[in-house]
């Protein structure tokens, strides 16, 4: 109620704009009886000509996802990689991730972050990442915005934030001496 939303310089009501956005949620919402290959076939029907089946297959291979294994047999990290492959296969300009690395083991989290870093190397791509894991933000963010109860408290360049603020770990006695 306090403003407007623009995505890629247009309103989110524009179907052409929505087609340029990939979304990854904390949990993958695919039928567990499906296989990654079946997910790709379903999404091809949704995205139409924008869907790149060859790229999706390449992503499955890159992410070491077995195309014929049912989703219920995949680990949480593998499900997240399937979710990411599904979001990337129509080659979006903007990738929106909501707690995409939450609950993953360190190895899976690192692999997801590497994939995101590869994605943003192309300056035509952007990532909007919602996360409570500050180390993830340190690794891939250029700008960090802090929202609290729906209010934007700040949006600053990550390097400026790192220079301006820090964490002091000490006892109360040491703090009192400062």
Regions found by a protein language model. Give the residues of each.
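ABC transporter nucleotide-binding domains
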Residues: 1-128, 132-135, 139-148, 154
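Conserved beta-strand-loop-alpha-helix hinge in the C-terminal portion
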Residues: 151-177
